[in-house]
């Protein structure tokens, strides 16, 4: 069995360099919620050095709230903003001898695109326009995954090691209790259940079906690196290969 491990980078976390030794894919902030041209260059350089797949992490234009503010923008605006961000990272990667492989939206752009078909379509269209060979990463079973498939893109369905789930397979909003799993044993058990058995227990006790093709590791938690190492070790024991 194979699984991709991804992390969001270039967002100002001190753990970026070490996380790149533990993951197989990097989602690099493109300036709209965090990062700038120099951090994008630095992250690409380190990803290439570690053999990690390079990906863009586009966002709503919301540096003030780290891309976590809900926005109602016209689809054409979202299309243009997404194309702008991923095009910039693709060029930075190419200039350093690398290749951008995937795109994963950030924060509220990701969450809204999981449920809003027009927004999902705008993102998928931008990814296709940039490069039809790019992989589109989205929440398992989401509108974004469906939109990517409609455009003929390769999609990758994502699950979260440290996030609580609702009965419909969506994430518990960060503003609600149960959104974050802080117990490492619980997070490990949830991740294995999703990867090995394709299901997750919701905060209300029901099982939700999920297709786990990539697991997101958050690098901004207090114990992020320690958990990443434990997860890698657990996968190794279970014979699960980590690869993009």
Curated annotation (Swiss-Prot):
InterPro entries: Glyco_hydro/deAcase_b/a-brl, LamB/YcsF/PxpA-like. It catalyses: 5-oxo-L-proline + ATP + 2 H2O = L-glutamate + ADP + phosphate + H(+). It is an enzyme of class 3 (hydrolase). GO terms for molecular function: 5-oxoprolinase (ATP-hydrolyzing) activity; ATP binding. GO terms for biological process: carbohydrate metabolic process. Keywords: ATP-binding, Hydrolase, Nucleotide-binding. Its EC number is 3.5.2.9. Forms a complex composed of PxpA, PxpB and PxpC. Catalyzes the cleavage of 5-oxoproline to form L-glutamate coupled to the hydrolysis of ATP to ADP and inorganic phosphate. NCBIfam families: PRK05406.1-1, PRK05406.1-3, PRK05406.1-4, PRK05406.1-5. Belongs to the LamB/PxpA family. This is 5-oxoprolinase subunit A. It comes from Shigella flexneri.
